Amino acid sequence: MLIATRNEGKTKEFRAIFDKLGYDVENLNDYPDLPEVAETGMTFEENARLKAETISQLTGKMVLADDSGLKVDVLGGLPGVWSARFAGVGATDRENNAKLLHELAMVFELKDRSAQFHTTLVVASPNKESLVVEADWSGYINFEPKGENGFGYDPLFLVGETGESSAELTLEEKNSQSHRALAVKKLLEVFPSWQSKPSL
């Protein structure tokens, strides 16, 4: 299974899930000659499809791509598909987190800072209709970062009503409940029947 990312944090989460199923997980760092796929889509699904289908065509392999992001209700769903570059192209996690806190500076009640981490997964294979699943993980945006684990907006994302940030969860805890874990769970329910479908 080739994961269409160079992000080792994301790969680690997928590897923890797919290892148990007997899949050997690679990522784009194993294929340095592959071109970068521009994420020009306006939705998570468009971006995930672009990555999965382009890389599958180039390599002839089964490819899993995800497009994930944070949707903050009071910001109309932003940062959304721009989550990784919310503070600008090439922005660090710290810069994106600072920008988000700045955007929410006048939102004083935690209940008004509701948000969802969203994942769309697309599996593409040569000559097959792509498989698409989506999932959300609901919570709130904290007033300051806390926790040392995870990546991205994890230090700001309070999980449900627990008061814990997703950066305070162990990888095992996160993989049992995160948006990515929920999407993978859905994927695993439909993957066997998709895999057994004849090619186009």
Curated annotation (Swiss-Prot):
Q: One GO molecular function term?
A: nucleoside triphosphate diphosphatase activity
Q: What does the entry's cofactor note say about binding and number?
A: Binds 1 Mg(2+) ion per subunit.
The record's keywords, sorted A to Z, are: Hydrolase, Magnesium, Metal-binding, Nucleotide metabolism, Nucleotide-binding
Disulphide bridges: none
Q: Needs which cofactor?
A: Mg(2+)
User: Is Hydrolase there in the keyword field?
Assistant: yes
Q: Where does substrate bind?
A: T5, R6, N7, E8, G9, K10, S68, F151, G152, Y153, D154, K174, H179, R180
- Family named by the database record: Belongs to the HAM1 NTPase family.
> What is the designated name of this protein?
dITP/XTP pyrophosphatase
